[in-house]
Swiss-Prot record:
The keyword Calcium does not apply. Pfam families: ACAS_N, AMP-binding, AMP-binding_C. Its cofactor is Mg(2+). This is Acetyl-coenzyme A synthetase. It comes from Shewanella sp. (strain MR-7).
Length: 650
């Protein structure tokens, strides 16, 4: 193996880990050669009401697409996260919660969480929620967010969690698409010392003329902030659960019945509702949580992701709770009120496993390691990275400053669509290289292909595809199965196309190189460029807009917008700021352009197609080798854009 920047597994970790390298190779080989036998055995890790006898019916043929796992079994996801632990671990702490203000803290045992979920599940039923109904959840990072999700799962309702940073328009589009009957929110959330007006955002979203399905809005009293009230529609969480029974029978769900919807950005502009089902997802979320983080019973596990993203679903709620872990949930951001907050929380709660994003690591790096002078960190055993590729400098800083050079780092690659981690080191099995996601998890068959779909062997670079299904895979785009087939299975026939590019080195390790479609990754969160462009051109003074990602020291990728104004409109810094606020209002703060360059024209082919590769290079300040411009209708546009670019290094 290439020794360049290689961090070898320590003997102590390998000796005590769930799997060492030899075991990984043996298990991986079995999972590929005999997937039915492998998953028949590992599917038993969760509790089934009616045990499965049929394991796998899958095909990536775009004319005959089929993704079915454990498909004759029945189960309940809520029971797997709660009821199964009550006999032996009712008093174990399930959730440790720390508020935005560190003085606010709560601990909830598995027994208490079970009671809260049962009461709220009965409350949902009292509001007319039935099996198969879609419930929109727009909540702060409080334990009640997990309670709401698990209560939906308990009664067979399908939850659709919307990130608390999204705007009313973004909420409305998701409510309309899912035809939600009930919305669950809070008066306000707290983040970084600021109150977030969640209820007000919901009120504004539900004023959209196309929102016609919502009958009830359940409101958690988090801050006591003033809220407007719609009589007959709005109801307080606490008034519902006060009288609700503590006993709630579980709904028996088929393995392929929907568990949740989660909307993710697409390259076409409209967010797509990723649909995950119950059986395969629960098997995969719990198995990856245990093996990737080498989880040991009773350990304290902290995933810093928001519940509104897939990481919060799989590795803050379903995976860890299915495994009986103690989960730390933090309402705020781990560098507020100072960069020392992350270390203080690790020490205060004796965290054993930390799962966070490169964006946070880079932000802490920029502040300096002096903020960790008082940090002990002796409880920490495993550290993970998620959301985007981590650059080697940030990896090393994370390893040295947070991990004190004794914690393995699992740099995980996966997607909303995959349900769980696909490419990752395993702590006791994988020597790591900073910046590499390394090797596939059990049952995962990655490959690299050229643009014609030919599989590339050996050390090479190409489009990252997957050759066969795994249990956690999404099943469809809600209400638009054709879009599912078109997006993931038409580009390369018989393969799942991830939308990412990757490099494979001489040791077979994978290095993710970033999106190859029109999606950008901002602070580990995916945004469709078409979504941002649509918001910009909806402003009356914007004639045309093109949006690309560019390298950003903190966020990984920033948002760079080229904007052509309507004839006669004057360019100004005031208008630039107005457009930034406009996008913020239309989509949310996450989508706010970092840089807006005025463009008298955009590079287009004679057929009118915008040549984004030129725009990406100019935004990245890579202007010396732009490549062939002969297909452009007006090559002079390029020179003008280069001269007026904003991201100069000089």
């Amino acid at each position: 193996m290439s020794s360049q920047s290689l961090y070898k597994v320590s003997g102590n970790i390998a000796a005590n880990a769930l799997v060492n390298n030899d075991q990984y190779k043996k298990m991986y080989q079995e999972s590929i050669v005999n997937p039915e036998g492998f998953w028949r055995e590992h599917g038993k890790r969760i509790d089934w009401i009616k045990p499965y006898t049929k394991i796998k019916k899958t095909s990536f043929d775009d004319h005959n697409l089929s993704i079915n796992w454990f498909y004759d079994g029945t189960l309940n996801a809520s029971a797997n996260c709660l009821d199964r632990h009550l006999a032996e671990h009712s008093d174990r702490v399930a959730i440790i919660w720390e508020g935005d203000n560190a003085s606010e803290q709560r601990k909830i045992t598995y027994g208490e969480l079970h009671t809260q979920v049962c009461k709220f599940a009965n409350a949902l039923r009292s509001q007319g929620v039935r099996r198969g109904d879609i419930v929109t959840i727009y909540m702060p990072m409080v334990p009640e967010a997990a309670v709401a999700m698990l209560a939906c799962a308990r009664i067979g309702a399908v939850h659709s969690v919307v990130f608390g940073g999204f705007s009313p328009d973004s909420i409305a589009s998701r409510v309309i698409d899912g035809k939600s009957k009930v919305v669950i929110t809070a008066d306000e959330g707290m983040r970084g010392g600021r109150a977030i007006p969640l209820k007000r955002n919901i009120d504004d979203a539900l004023k959209h003329p196309d929102v016609t399905s919502v009958e009830k809005v359940i409101v958690l009293k988090r801050t006591g902030g003033k809220v407007d009230w719609v009589e007959g529609r709005d109801v307080w969480w606490h008034s519902l659960v006060e009288t609700a029974s503590e006993h709630c029978a579980i709904e028996e769900m088929g393995a392929e019945d929907p568990l949740f919807l989660l909307y993710t950005s697409g390259s076409t502009g409209n967010p797509k509702g990723v649909l995950h089902t119950t059986g395969g997802y629960m098997v995969y979320a719990s198995m990856t949580h245990e093996y990737v983080f080498d989880y040991k019973p009773g350990e304290i596990y902290w995933c810093t992701a928001d519940v509104g993203w897939i990481t919060g679903h799989s590795y803050m709620v379903y995976g860890p709770l299915a495994n009986g872990a103690t989960v730390l949930i933090h309402e705020g951001i781990p560098n507020h009120p100072s960069p020392a907050r992350l270390g203080e929380m690790i020490d205060r709660h004796k965290v054993n496993i930390l799962y966070t994003a490169p964006t946070l690591i880079r932000a802490l790096m920029a502040e300096g390691k002096q903020h960790f002078d008082k940090y002990d960190g002796s409880s920490l055993r495993i550290m993970g990275s998620v959301g985007e590729p981590i650059n080697p400098e940030a990896w090393r800083w994370y390893h040295e400053v947070i991990g004190h050079e004794h914690c393995p780092i699992v740099d995980t690659w996966w997607q909303t669509e995959t349900g769980g981690i696909l490419i990752t080191p395993l702590p006791g099995a994988t020597d790591t290289k900073p910046g590499s996601a390394t090797r596939p998890f059990f049952g995962v068959q990655p490959a690299l292909v050229d643009n014609m779909g030919n599989i590339l062997e050996g050390a090479t670079e190409g489009n990252l595809v997957l050759l066969d299904s795994w249990p956690g895979q999404m099943r469809t785009v809600y209400g638009d199965h054709e879009r599912f087939v078109l997006t993931y299975f038409k580009t390369f026939r018989g393969m799942y196309f991830t939308g990412d590019g990757a490099r494979r080195d001489e040791d077979g390790y994978y290095w993710i190189t970033g999106r190859v479609d029109d999606v950008i990754n901002v602070s580990g969160h995916r945004l469709g460029t078409a979504e941002v462009e649509s918001a910009l051109v909806s402003h009356e003074l914007v004639a045309e807009a093109a949006v690309v990602g560019y390298p950003h020291d903190i966020k990984g990728q920033g948002i760079y917008a080229y904007v052509t104004l309507t004839r006669g409109t004057e360019e100004s810094e005031e208008l630039r700021q107005e457009l930034r606020q406009w996008v913020r209002k239309e989509i949310g703060a996450l989508a706010t352009p970092d840089l807006i360059q005025w463009a008298t024209g955009l590079p287009k082919t004679r057929s009118g197609k915008i040549m984004r590769r030129f725009l990406r290079k100019i935004a990245a300040n890579e202007v010396t080798n732009l490549g062939d411009a002969s297909t452009l209708a007006d090559p002079a546009v390029i020179e003008t854009l280069i001269e007026t670019r904003l991201n100069r290094n000089e």
